[in-house]
Design a protein with these regions (language model features):
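Conserved, mostly hydrophobic/aromatic
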Residues: 12, 42, 50, 94, ...
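Catalytic cores of alpha/beta
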Residues: 75, 79-101, 181-216, 236
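C-terminal helical cap(s) of enzyme catalytic domains, especially alpha/beta-barrels
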Residues: 114-121, 210-243
Length: 243
């Protein structure tokens, strides 16, 4: 089987700036400049997808929606929008902005009846974020731990979820390598597609995740490694698409 992995650069926005957090902690922030310019850089480098996160909305402390809208409007890439999508109004705003997919985290766990309705209507455009710490789902900007991820997947699979984004919180923003065991474990309990996120530090990490494509891993979100110059997006794409 040909193993082609999609590489998705990430732009996390806080207080109007492109930033990276370490393990989701708001007190460990690195500023990487203008998010719109960062998006243009990824576009020029050949990325076809972009993952955009409004961190302030995710934490419930504000909004960077005007910047998100600017990115969606100006950038000729497919956009995944994430952060603070928890009800009909915020979901509709994300869809009408022109984004191709919307990532839902907290509400998918805390509001089962709502996410079931959304998946019944728009499953192809929805990603459910499984942000995992010690085997359990963390919500509300990763500040509250809830149910085991396997329990969440059983319910969400039954409701028609087609795509999950799996993040090992302990790896996110650390450049210590992805949790391949977790990715394999999640893939083993669902037939839905999985997007890997968190910890990617080297091109070898990209190659390792590419080996999991036959198990259901379809793409990988990369953030800090790109900002810190560990490799370029074009180099990552070349490795990911190597047969």
């Amino acid at each position: 089987m040909e193993q082609i992995l999609t590489v998705i650069p990430a732009i996390d926005i806080k207080d109007g700036r492109a930033v990276r957090l370490r393990q989701g902690r708001r007190d460990q922030v690195t500023d990487y400049g203008d998010p719109v310019e960062r998006a243009h850089e990824f576009e020029r480098a050949g990325a076809t997808w972009l993952h955009v996160v409004d961190l302030d909305a995710a934490f419930g402390v504000g909004s960077n929606w005007k910047i998100v809208e600017s990115i969606v409007r100006e950038i000729d890439m497919k956009i995944e929008v994430s952060g603070g999508v928890r009800d009909d109004a915020s979901l509709e705003r994300a869809f009408t902005s022109g984004s191709h997919r919307v990532t839902i985290g907290t509400a998918a766990i805390e509001n089962p009846s709502w996410i079931a309705k959304i998946l019944n209507r728009d499953a192809g455009k929805v990603i459910v974020a499984l942000d995992i710490r010690d085997g359990r789902i963390a919500t509300r900007g990763w500040t509250e731990e809830t149910i085991p991820y396997s329990e969440a997947i059983r319910r969400l699979d039954g409701e028609g979820c087609l795509r999950y984004m799996v993040t090992d919180i302990s790896k996110d923003g650390t450049l210590t390598g992805p949790n391949l065991e977790l990715l394999e474990a999640v893939s083993a309990v669902t037939s839905s597609s999985v997007i890997a996120s968190g910890g990617v530090a080297t091109l070898e990490d990209i190659a390792s995740i590419r080996e999991l494509v036959p198990q259901g891993i379809e793409s990988v979100v990369v953030g800090k490694a790109l900002y810190e110059g560990a490799f370029t997006i074009s180099e990552a794409i070349e490795v990911a698409e190597r047969s």
